[in-house]
Amino acid sequence: MRETVKLIEVARELPVSRKNLQMLLLLLLCGAAAYIINLADPALEPLFLALVFGIVAGNLQRDEEKKRVVERYVPFLLPIGITLYGVNINIPYLGEFHPEIVAATLISTSLIFLTVFWLSSRLKLSRQMSILLACGSGICGVSAIAIISPLIKPRKEEFSAAIMIITAVGLTGAILYPSIAHYASISPDEFAVLAGATLHQTGIVKISSQLFGVEEEALAIKGIRIAMIALVVLILSIIYSESRFYVPWYIVSFLGVALFSSTYLPGEVVQALRPLATVMFATTLAAICYTVNVGRVQRVGVKPLFASYAGWAVGVAFVLLLLGSGAL
């Protein structure tokens, strides 16, 4: 209740003028454009596109007053965007899967997460950057990074770099997986397991698996990993809370929306709400990245890229080993 009142107070304090409304419209256009492009090419994650649009717009205009205005809108947009994005999280019923597939997916996800986090730590990346890369690699790509970032509070350049890196690794997978499937002689059903258990973004899983006619199977397996974001968010919110056992209200509402939309809302209602949720969250990312300096993003270096690729390679090797041994 207290934080709801606080959000209302933030909304009341937002600067309202013709110029500021034009800025808000620009951010909304960034989010809408990202969503529309994703409809044409699902491999291009709308949150990633919104990030790029926000960075480009901010660095082209170089108006410090506008950046200050945008920064004041972010605390209002972020909790709403995260809450609504819960409709994009489908919590699957694990009884629909073979136990060995569930186990393999959970183990490979954990293996990727731990490998990326360990390597990032060894390479002396910040704890926040390590968590962003680990969650993005192991769970659900850009979405995971965007959802957990308010909890761990990384630097803006780390946030932007993590999204770009995870997108690059995912696109690499989309290019290489057909060749891997050919040389490893795996069946379409086995490819669904490989794609669903190791690829980063949902759109890339969809495109890759369409080539083998196993789109639904691969997306269902990917859904197991996506559902893990609920547990990770809950754990991180407790670890990083300023008060003991405190979970931010927008995290609770995000989890509630995800659970409600997965179990009670009719499928057609969920499908109708997802565009709104995606555009809203994409708009929020455009606002966050509007104030990002490109030069600082470049200074992040190649170490995060190495850690992410290495963790992904370990996950792929593990799943291929299981498939080759006949365990799946």
From Swiss-Prot:
Domain of life: Archaea
Transmembrane stretches, start-end: 21-39, 43-60, 73-95, 101-123, 130-152, 162-184, 191-213, 223-240, 245-267, 271-293, 305-327
InterPro entries found in the cross-reference section: UPF0324_pro, UPF0324_YeiH-like
Statement: the UniProt record of this protein carries the keyword Amino-acid biosynthesis: no
Keywords: Cell membrane, Membrane, Transmembrane, Transmembrane helix
Localization annotation: Cell membrane
Membrane topology designation: Multi-pass membrane protein
Keyword Cell membrane belongs to the record: yes
One Pfam assignment: Cons_hypoth698
CC per GO annotation: plasma membrane
Family: Belongs to the UPF0324 family.
Name of the molecule in the record: UPF0324 membrane protein AF_1621
